[in-house]
C-alpha cells in the first residue's frame, strides 16, 4: 500500500455530494423558469433560490417512502420552483396572471378568453388545483370536458349533444378524468407525505 490515505466515499445522501452531482438539474430548472423573472437582479436571485430549495429537498427526502431520489428531486425541484415563481408573480403583479393556449398554440391572457368574472374565478380555482402538479397534462377532450362542466356550466347531456356522441361516452371520459386526478394525487401524496388537497 502506498502512503496515501484512502478517502471514504460520501454517503449517498450527503448534501454537498448531491449538490455537485445534480448541478445540471439545477441549471436546467433555472433555464426553464428564468424568463418568468421581471428583471436581471431577480434572475440572479432565482439561481440562489433554486439552490436553497434543492438543499431543503435533500434534507426532507425520506428513502423509506419508496420513491427514488432522482425522480423525487427532479419533480420536487421543478414543482417548488414553479410555486416560488407563482408567488413571485403574484407579489409583482398584485394578482395571478393566468395564461392559456388556444387551438392554434397562441398564448392568450385569461382575460382575453373569458369575459365572465365568475367563470374566471372558477377557472382560477381549477388552475390552482392543477398547479399543485403542473406536469399533469390533460388531453384536449378532458380539457374541453372540464371547461364545459365548470366554466360553461353545461350538463353532461348538453355536452354530449353538442359533440354528437352518446352520453355514456362522456360518463366514461369523466370517469377516466377523475381516475387520472386520483392517480396523480396519490403520487403527490406519496412524495409530499401529506394530503395537499
Curated annotation (Swiss-Prot):
Which is one GO molecular function term here?
sigma factor activity
Query: Which keywords does this chain's UniProt record carry?
Result: DNA-binding, Sigma factor, Transcription, Transcription regulation
Q: What does this protein do?
A: Sigma factors are initiation factors that promote the attachment of RNA polymerase to specific initiation sites and are then released.
- What name is this protein filed under? RNA polymerase sigma GP34 factor
Amino acid at each position: 500500500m502506498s502512503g496515501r490515505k484512502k478517502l471514504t466515499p460520501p454517503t449517498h445522501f450527503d448534501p454537498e455530494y448531491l449538490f455537485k452531482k445534480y448541478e445540471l438539474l439545477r441549471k436546467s430548472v433555472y433555464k426553464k423558469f428564468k424568463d418568468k423573472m421581471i428583471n436581471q437582479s431577480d434572475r440572479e436571485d432565482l439561481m440562489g433560490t433554486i439552490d436553497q430549495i434543492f438543499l431543503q429537498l435533500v434534507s426532507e427526502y425520506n428513502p423509506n417512502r419508496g420513491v427514488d431520489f432522482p425522480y423525487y428531486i427532479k419533480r420536487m425541484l421543478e414543482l417548488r420552483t414553479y410555486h416560488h415563481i407563482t408567488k413571485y408573480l403574484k407579489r409583482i403583479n398584485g394578482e395571478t396572471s393566468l395564461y392559456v393556449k388556444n387551438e392554434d398554440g397562441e398564448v392568450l391572457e385569461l382575460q382575453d378568453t373569458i369575459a365572465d368574472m365568475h367563470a374566471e374565478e372558477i377557472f382560477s380555482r381549477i388552475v390552482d388545483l392543477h398547479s399543485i402538479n403542473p406536469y399533469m397534462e390533460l388531453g384536449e377532450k378532458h380539457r374541453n370536458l372540464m371547461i364545459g362542466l365548470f366554466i360553461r356550466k353545461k350538463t353532461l347531456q348538453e355536452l354530449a349533444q353538442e359533440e354528437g356522441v352518446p352520453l355514456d361516452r362522456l360518463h366514461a371520459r369523466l370517469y377516466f378524468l377523475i381516475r387520472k386526478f386520483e392517480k396523480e394525487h396519490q403520487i403527490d401524496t406519496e412524495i409530499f407525505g401529506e394530503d395537499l388537497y
